UniProtKB/Swiss-Prot annotation:
Keywords per UniProt: Disulfide bond, Ion channel impairing toxin, Neurotoxin, Secreted, Toxin, Voltage-gated sodium channel impairing toxin
Highest taxon, organism lineage: Eukaryota
Protein name: Beta-toxin Chui3
Described function: Beta toxins bind voltage-independently at site-4 of sodium channels (Nav) and shift the voltage of activation toward more negative potentials thereby affecting sodium channel activation and promoting spontaneous and repetitive firing. Acts on human sodium channel Nav1.6/SCN8A.
Pfam families (alphabetical): Toxin_3 (PF00537)
Database matches in SUPFAM superfamilies: Scorpion toxin-like (SSF57095)
Family classification: Belongs to the long (4 C-C) scorpion toxin superfamily. Sodium channel inhibitor family. Beta subfamily.
Tissue-level expression: Expressed by the venom gland.
Keyword Signal: no
Location of the LCN-type CS-alpha/beta domain: 1-66
Residue pairs linked by disulfide bridges in the UniProt entry: C12-C65, C16-C41, C25-C46, C29-C48
Length: 66
């Protein structure tokens, strides 16, 4: 599974500005989803890869980013 890293409290994607390989996104994806996860910056949001199927990613139901 893959998807955008989401702030569970707000429903917002984690923003990033250095597209492609991005240490911040990689670190945050691993912190949320475990050391097997990957991550990079895609369309100014942290995109996480190699996730387990039940991983929660953006968009969240009933939560819109404001």
């Amino acid at each position: 599974k893959e998807g955008y890293l989401v702030e569970l409290g707000t429903g917002c994607k984690y923003e990033c500005f250095k597209l492609g390989d991005n240490d911040y996104c990689l670190r945050e994806c691993k912190a949320r989803y475990g050391k097997g996860a990957g991550g990079y910056c895609y369309a100014f949001g942290c995109w996480c890869t190699q996730l387990y199927e039940q991983a929660v990613v953006w968009p969240l139901k009933n939560k819109t980013c404001r």
